[in-house]
Structures are given as C-alpha cells and as structure tokens.
C-alpha cells in the first residue's frame, strides 16, 4: 500500500531484506515461494531512495560512514567496512558522494543506489546488474560515476515560476458559499525543475 501511494505500481515485493527468500529459511512471508525475490525497476528504486532520504534523513549518517567499530575495546571488537567504494578513502572515491546502498543477488547482479550533492543540488542514481562485475568489482561504481557526471554536465535545477506567480489557465477559482464567489490564485512558493542545459 505504501509504495503504491508513491506511484509504484508494478513492483514485486516479497520481503523487507532485499535478499532472495532462500536466505530467510522459515521466515519468509506467507504466500511467497522459497526462491522468490523482490523485483523493481530502476525508477522504482529511485523513488524508494528519495522517500528514505526525505522521511528518514538520519539514515544518511549511517550510509556515509566509511568504517565503524562495534564493541570497541572488548574481545568482541569488530570493524565493519562500507561496501560503497565511492566514499572517501575507497578505490572509486568521488567527491560529493555520500551514500547510499549496494546490493548483489544472482538475479539482480551488482547494483548500486548512489547519491551525490554538488553545488547544493542532490541527485539519485540507480545502476542495476552492472556489466562485467565478476571481472571488475568496481563496475557498478564506474557506471554510477558516468551517470553522475552526465547529469551535472547536462542538467540544472532552475526556477521556472517565482512565488506569487499566477497560472495562465487558473487565475481565479470558485469559492462555494463565500462572501466572494471567486478568489485569485497564486503560487505560495517558487517552483523549480531540473531542465536540460540546452533548453530555453
């Protein structure tokens, strides 16, 4: 129900882990098969990532942490290393990248949801089933860097309607049972959109 309210209509979701059901043993969702797996388009994954960042911004703090030591100073001390190689200190570091999630399954291949902020503008990229991942473990990050570079080189966020603007086809609206039968309509806030650099 939640993803449908976000406009995601054709995804197949069988669990919250993202793993194939075969890893979950007896803990699979009733009515799903033991080998079922979540299926989503790149667009759907980007929508989920956008909502994660908007609704739970604190998740970004975890996503951008390169390494974390648990149970420090004890005999159970464990260092966990982030699988996102685009973070500072890693092989595929790219300035501005601060998340978000890697994933690999037999069906989906090597995947990565990358997020980056540059000049105050954040983008979300999604790479699914990166080619040659078995030969080059950096493949998903190389393709992500290409997407990020292309986006910032060819697109920009631009204010298309300032606050107070009136829409040509909607300068007034009817007011039921009001003292006045119509009232003027204008935008409370400015409207900005991503537009191609070559568009006027």
Q: At which residue positions do the language-model features occur?
A:
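Short linear capping/connector segments at secondary-structure termini
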Residues: 15-21, 65-66
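Short, charged, amphipathic alpha-helices and their helix-cap/turn boundaries
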Residues: 1-18
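Domain-terminus/edge residues, biased toward the C-terminal soluble/receptor-binding domains
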Residues: 25-200
